[in-house]
Amino acid sequence: MNRKTKFFALIFGLILAQSLFNLLSAQISGKWHGKLIINEKTNLTVAFEIKGNKAGNLSSVMHSVDQKAFNIPVDTVYAEGNDVTIIINSLAAKYTGQLINKDGIDGHMAFPGGAQMKLDLQKVDRFPFSIAERPQEPKEPLPYFSDDIEFLNKKLGIKLKGTITTPSKEGQYPAVVLISGSGASDRNQTIFGHKTFLVMSDFLTRAGFAVLRYDDRGAAESEGSFLSATILDHAEDAAYAVDFLKSREFVDTLSIGLIGHSLGADIAPVTATINPSVSYVILMAGAAKPLQEIILEQCDAIYPTMGISDSATTLNKDILQSLFEVVRVAPDTKVAREQGALILKQFEERASALTQEDKNLIGYSTPLDIKTWSGLFIPYMKHDLFHDNERYLKQLKCPVLVIGGNKDLQVLPHHVKLIEDILVSNGNKRVTAKIYPGKNHLLQDAITGSPSEYGDIENTIAPDVINDIIHWLRTQTGRIPRIN
């Protein structure tokens, strides 16, 4: 074969490969939904909207329909042959499946700790559900600047991607870093179909503040490993975010603060000890106690709203306490998982005595399966379960706003007072604390406060809460006029 023939053969091969790729892209593109099988009695409706461009590249969002969590960002979608892979970093989840025909995919969703759940997808022209409206999400055109950025964790050399919003490129503005809660969050802290940090950054920037929000380490576009990143690691990332803000000419470097939500409120005090440039801190729905205690409190608060009996609640708390100790003393997560499986055997008799309804509601299989508690065997849990929040709260000497809702079932409202007492008793005289009546863990206006309601509530954050945050920030910074 001469050079010319080889050249045309190569070009033909590339064209053929691209044509096949585009054909596969077209076949995968569309609306897909199915049932994620949690156990024999429990499943969740999951859907994907997959789009392909002219180059054959795929993108997608995910909907967890029963949880009212819509438009969850998908980080990677690719197809090769009949194999389909979808990666959702914010859930630390990976879907793998095979096309069985033009309208069907057989597959599984994998989660941290080795959990594998069956998820077969069917292609449809229209979803049999509606996507909730989110009236607080900003609409273009925006009356401020929004720029995608990246900053470096210099210690590890990993790039963290995010967005900075600024009232103007002229003058200098007080600034805040938003620190997300548990789970691999994207920069918007997308949860139950709400983009909490997108909405907050919009309100705050319109009020005259520069705002930096970013994808967690290992989530969405940021580099690094989320599964091994502890509270201390995330605090370090946030400290580098503060340094990044200090390098921006439109930021008042003497007025940079932190706003942490949920676990982010546990991270923020650590960040403030790492980076002395932090001028003020807002703790939203944060905890005064270690995560292991918060999880047990959640059982007592949430299980009754689900109809779970006292005996089932007590059993699960006993199992959790035993597994916490296993995680604490085991040298690594693999050993902890193996030892945890053995520990479960001593609870089999009590679990068997539960009603079938309790088993279904709490997610127990028979016999007990360690996969039910797989979330405890993620590497970062060895630290985070036992992280001493009080140690770092005691070191906060800057102005602090502590807020929570009296219908918060994830971090109970008494933690607002506990945090306030810790701060004040250690000499901080610039503490403001408030418990909002009728507000849940997301600081929304709630009915019961149950997490199952989050997605049903249209507003992402209650207007009175965000207005109070803005007022408090202005009090600390001495400015700024509102923009429209």
Language-model segments: which ranges?
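Alpha/beta-hydrolase active-site loop
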Residues: 228-249
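Central antiparallel beta-sheet cores of small beta-barrel/beta-sandwich binding domains
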Residues: 27-100, 106-113, 143-144, 197
